[in-house]
UniProtKB/Swiss-Prot annotation:
Coiled-coil portions: 131-163, 205-377, 431-535, 562-679, 716-745
Species: Homo sapiens (Human)
Xref: InterPro entries: CCDC175
Protein name: Coiled-coil domain-containing protein 175
Gene symbol of the encoding locus: CCDC175
Keywords assigned: Coiled coil
């Protein structure tokens, strides 16, 4: 009776077993979920990202490093999402297997159901909580990464715009700098042409000066030769004049003695005439005395003729000396005129040289101004270079910051690699592929890091070279400025000296002109004096000629009267009457003799005056000669001083020319440096143009990749939203599953309590028998598989 109510329970148990067998279907259907879990778009995005990664790994593709890193980060994030998706699928499969195990245990092991169900429920709850927490953490991480990516995108857009503006500014500055350089080079070319022209002109002027110096030297040599000849002639003429003066003095002494003798004879003649008058009686003696007197008269007539001849010779010599003196004066005047003409020519050449020197000085001033302008332009270019260098340093600091950011990203990548290693332990099938990809990426990163290190080393070397070059250029510019200042000081000193010398030369020229005027006046006075003396000499010569003619007439008369005297002597006795006539004649002759004596006295007095005048003229001539010699010496001293001044000026001109040569050599050195700088600038221009072209190409590629990236990001955002919806659905289903598990646990607890009651009611032997004959079947509530539908949406 007690067992009767249990029979329907057995039937109910069979029904429950059948229901339980039917309920195993949904749990098995969980294992047949699709591999994509409803994210086909993510697979397409992964394929596109793999293509992008391959293109990034290729050496042909060139893009900004930040864009590369950004794309790599996106690829890694998408890979992580795909791995998370696969991990969730694996976990769901594991949970389905565990549920199948639980169903199997519930079916096969009714005795140990409590422990296993409790452990299963605990494990399931723990796993569910852990999975929920991990999913939440991953969702927050993905959201944070998405926000970071958006911030990076905005920063990159801003940085790209700033770089575009900077590039435009740099292009404008570069164009301005190129224009300024072209202008400076044109100015330098014009200055070099002008310098070459001035150098050629200076060389021509130098050659002209050398020719003039040669002409001056030749003229000086001729002057010295003519001076020597003039001195020799002068010495010869002075010797001849001294000889003639000596002979003249000897003859003068002889004439003076003869005059004395004539006076004595005249006294004797007077005495004889007195004796003749007194001793008229003694005719024989008188005749003898008359004969003696005639002989003495003849003797004295011969001496007088000789004296006349000597006087004629002396007059001829005086004429010769006067002619030679006039010739010598003419020659000296011609030589003086030649020297004056040469001095005038030299003064004209000096004036022309001064004018040329002034022109050259003005040209030097213009060149100095142009040089200062070029220096100011070079300073401006140097300041522009410094600005460009500062901008480069700013860019380098920005690059260093980016490198630091890259190092941080590398650390993040290493952490991600560690996470990948942990994931590779779970997925052994994809381990080799990901390791190869990671090796390739690490190799590329090492290459890029090595390239970055090499480029940094090159940049440091170039900076050092640039710093050394700038230091050298500054030192050279300072040395040049010091040299230019010294040259300007020296030039100012030379200009002062030249002005002082010019003043001295002008003073010397004025003195020379004064001396020339004085010499001309003295020469005119001397010529006038000579003319007056010549006139006086001509007058005295005419008087002397008249007196000689009178003496000749008287001698002829005496010759005529001699035969008459002989006749008178012969007829003295016969013609005594004629004595009175003769006495009258003698008295007349006495008167004539007195007149002759008076004339002789006057002649002697005039001759003495003439001699005194000649001595005065000689003294004046000596004084004039001394004055001329002094003046010539002064002229020679002035000429020597002028020659010394010319020599000093020539030396100064040579020094200036040497300084000009040095300046030209330094200008050539500067030109070479400028050409080197220009070549370096052209190389920089080419490199900058190449870099600008590369930047333009990279910008185009970057824009294309950026558009693709934006499309992919949009797709990924859409896919992420879908995945989030899927994850939310999964969490809802997991919650429903937990609730169902709780219901199952409550039902199991109720069944366990029922079993306990049954155990308490029945004996253990009955239970063993029942266990042998009866297999209990548990009926679980049928749960429809809605997860498949929700997951496959």
């Amino acid at each position: 009776m007690a067992l009767s109510p249990w029979t329907p329970g057995l039937g109910a148990g069979e029904k429950l077993v059948q229901a339980a067998a039917v309920s195993t279907g949904p749990s098995l259907e969980l294992c047949t979920l699709p591999s994509t879990l409803g994210s086909s778009v993510a697979v397409e995005a992964l394929e596109q990202l793999f293509v992008v990664e391959q293109s990034l790994q290729s050496d042909y593709f060139k893009c900004n490093e930040e864009a590369k890193i950004f794309l790599k980060d996106i690829a890694v994030a998408v890979k992580k999402l795909e791995e998370m998706r696969k991990a969730t699928i694996d976990l769901l499969e594991i949970e389905s297997m565990e549920l199948n195990k639980l169903y199997y245990l519930l079916e096969t092991l009714p005795n140990s159901i409590k422990r296993e169900l409790e452990e299963c429920v605990r494990d399931a709850r723990r796993l569910n909580l852990f999975e929920i927490n991990t999913i939440k953490m991953r969702i927050t991480r993905t959201e944070n990464e998405i926000e970071l990516l958006k911030k990076k995108i905005t920063d990159l857009t801003k940085y790209n715009e700033a770089l575009g503006e900077k590039q435009e500014e740099l292009a404008r500055k570069h164009a301005r700098f190129v224009l300024s350089l072209n202008q400076t080079m044109e100015k330098k070319a014009t200055t070099t042409v002008y310098i070459n022209e001035t150098y050629t002109k200076i060389n021509l002027k130098r050659e002209d000066i050398a020719l003039q110096k040669k002409c001056i030297q030749e003229a000086e040599e001729l002057m010295e030769k003519e001076r020597a000849e003039y001195l020799i002639r002068k010495q010869e003429l002075t010797a001849q004049i001294n000889e003639f003066e000596n002979t003249r003095e000897v003859k003068r002494m002889e004439t003076y003695q003869k005059k004395k003798e004539l006076d004595k004879l005249q006294t004797k003649m007077s005495k004889i005439k007195e004796t003749v008058t007194v001793s008229a009686a003694v005719l024989s003696d008188h005749n003898l005395e008359i004969a003696r007197l005639h002989e003495s008269i003849r003797y004295w007539e011969q001496e007088v003729s000789e004296l006349k001849k000597d006087l004629a010779i002396l007059e001829a010599k005086l004429c010769f000396f006067t002619d030679n003196k006039e010739k010598l004066d003419d020659i000296s005047n011609d030589e003086k005129n030649e020297f004056l003409n040469k001095i005038k020519q030299l003064v004209e050449t000096l004036h022309a040289a001064r004018m040329e020197y002034k022109d050259l000085r003005e040209k030097m001033k213009t060149l100095a101004r142009q040089y200062k302008i070029v220096l100011s332009e070079e300073e401006k270019a140097f300041l522009q270079k410094q600005k460009i260098h500062d901008e480069n340093q700013k860019q380098l600091t920005f690059i260093s910051q980016k490198e630091y950011f890259l190092s941080q990203k590398r650390v993040d990548i290493k952490n991600m690699e560690e996470g990948l290693i942990t994931l590779q332990e779970l997925q052994q099938a994809t381990k080799t592929v990901y390791q190869q990809q990671i090796k390739i990426l690490s190799a590329n990163l090492e290459r890029e890091s090595q390239r970055c290190v090499i480029t940094q080393w090159k940049m440091a070397c170039l900076r050092k070279k640039h710093a050394r070059w700038t230091a050298k250029i500054k030192a050279e510019i300072q040395a040049i400025t010091e040299k230019i200042q010294n040259a300007e000081v020296r030039r100012i000193e030379l200009l002062n000296e030249t002005s002082f010398r010019q003043q001295e030369i002008s003073g010397f020229v004025a003195q020379i002109e004064k001396l020339t005027t004085e010499l001309k006046e003295e020469e005119k006075a001397f010529v006038n004096k000579e003319k007056m003396l010549m006139k006086e000499l001509s007058k005295y010569e005419e008087i002397f000629v008249k007196e000689t003619q009178i003496n000749k007439e008287k001698e002829e008369e005496l010759v005529e009267y001699l035969p008459q005297l002989q006749v008178a002597e012969q007829e003295y006795k016969e013609k005594r009457r004629k004595l009175e006539e003769l006495s009258n004649i003698i008295t007349a002759q006495r008167q004539e003799e007195d007149l002759l004596n008076n004339h002789i006295f006057l002649f002697t007095r005039d001759f003495s005056r003439y001699i005194s005048n000649m001595e005065d003229v000689k003294q004046e001539l000596q004084q004039l000669r001394d004055q001329e010699s002094k003046k010539n010496k002064d002229h020679f001293e002035t000429l020597k001083n002028l020659e010394n001044g010319f020599y000093i000026n020539d030396q100064k001109a040579d020094l200036l020319l040497l300084e000009n040569k040095k300046l030209k050599e330094y200008i050539l050195y500067l030109k070479n440096n400028i050409e080197k700088y220009r070549e370096g600038q052209e190389a920089l221009m080419h490199t900058s143009s190449d870099l600008s072209r590369q930047l333009i190409a990279q910008e185009a590629q970057y824009k294309d990749l950026w558009a693709e990236f934006q499309t992919t990001v949009k797709i990924l955002v859409d896919n992420g939203e879908e995945t989030l919806q899927d994850i939310n659905n999964l969490t809802d289903k997991l919650r429903e599953r937990d609730e169902k598990m709780q219901h199952v646990s409550t039902w199991l607890r109720g069944s366990l309590e029922g079993l306990r009651l049954l155990v308490e009611q029945e004996s253990p032997m009955d239970l063993l028998k029942k266990k042998k004959h009866i297999r209990t079947r548990v009926h679980f509530p049928v749960v429809k598989c809605t997860e498949k539908n929700t997951l496959t949406k």
